[in-house]
Amino acid sequence: MATALVVGGRGFIGGFIVSALKQRGWQVRVLARPHGRMLAEGEVAGDLLRMLDAEDWAQALQGVSVVVNAAGILREEGRQQFEAIHVRAPLALAQACVSRGVRFVQISALGDPRDGGFIASKHRFDSALLALPLEAIVLRPSVVYSHRGSYGGTSLLRALAAFPWRQLLPGTGDWQFQPVCAEDLAQVAAVACTQGTAGIYDIGCAIPLSLHDYQAQWRRWLRIPGRRSWRVPLPLVRAQVWLGQWLGRGPVNRTIWNMLLRGNLTAAESHQRVQAEFGVQVRDLGEVLDAEPSQMQDRWAALLYFLVPWLKWSVVLLWLWSGIVGLVTDAAVIEAMARGSYLQAMQPVLLARGAGVLDLLLGAGLAWAPRPRPVVLAMLISVAAYALVFGALLPQQFLEPLGGLAKSVALLPALGVLWVLVDRR
């Protein structure tokens, strides 16, 4: 079997490309950062931030006949910069492909470079790639979605469509784009590994959709009642975009907003050109959704989208408040609470202050940790420990009129749900 190297194969789009290649009989090698873990079967170690020269790609390219680059970041953070991820590393890879006669398929993005650094850097590499003496195909998709999952902005749009009673619609919702199913994009990429004239191909469905129509179709597919919309005023939308840009988090940033405002449309005749060149028809959204009925899990994912941050930040505030209370409560009050129990001989004031510091650290950790699951697990352990220890030493806490320690019975499964939901990949 011929071997394909997929860069970004563990991402949303890359995963579908890996699957499509395997369906067509390819042996697939996926570039992956180890992060201290054992590599899975078919993975090869690599880090785009360190593979900035052609010779750095020699091992990954051994026995490879085609490369598919689906790597990308929507915003810069720390060492993750557009220039390195979108330009320098893939250009070094492409230069290494020249001497080995390896074909190159680039997953770029449809848009205007003036929309922001994400688009500008993608298109800058596209031009550099096509200037090299190698067989190169550049695919520029519009908004990419899948009924089998979502990520980033498509998750947000699906959640807006599924909002209880009425969908939430940014502004008037009349912005036009041509969404493409991830499975169709993956099939085009897989075919492009062996055929197609070098050049740039815009990828999108045949008929442009407005944002309102896009969300309405998703709502019908999810079988959520209500056809009306609550229109979110543009100033509020712009404020949310500004906040997301400033925080460096969330599915929306200034580039995505600019792309939406400008409209994300393919060039004339692009749909027909893609079908003629690769033999793949990029389906309209309605056709894709009609092919597969929604399931309960699809509705859960859409309806839980806004509940996840609500749950997360409620837990953050609860832990920070608990920490503050543990640090500022008068020592006499703490000693009075412990009087007559086993805690009286265990320096209860010191225990309360220590627990307060721990709660503050856990609350801050959940708020800012890039990988929050270990923090949530620590919270689970601490709540279970509090319930067991204080339940044994101060059993009267379970009998307080307002619940007191008894509320930990509900808090434990809530933290278990949060542990599952905070992992967005």
Q: Where are the regions a protein language model picked out?
A:
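N-terminal Rossmann NAD(P)H-binding glycine-rich loop of SDR-like oxidoreductase domains
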Residues: 4-24
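Conserved cofactor-binding/catalytic machinery of classical short-chain dehydrogenase/reductase
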Residues: 88-92, 125, 181-184, 362, ...
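NAD(P)H-binding glycine-rich loop region in Rossmannoid oxidoreductase-like domains
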Residues: 36-92, 96-98, 110-113
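Oxidoreductase cofactor-interface core, primarily capturing Rossmann-like NAD(P)-dependent enzymes
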Residues: 114-222
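Residues forming the Rossmann-fold NAD(P)(H) cofactor-binding site
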Residues: 14-16, 87, 123
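Mid/C-terminal beta-alpha module of Rossmann-like enzyme folds, strongest
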Residues: 191-254, 266-308
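Extended, low-polarity transmembrane helix blocks
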Residues: 252-331, 346-425
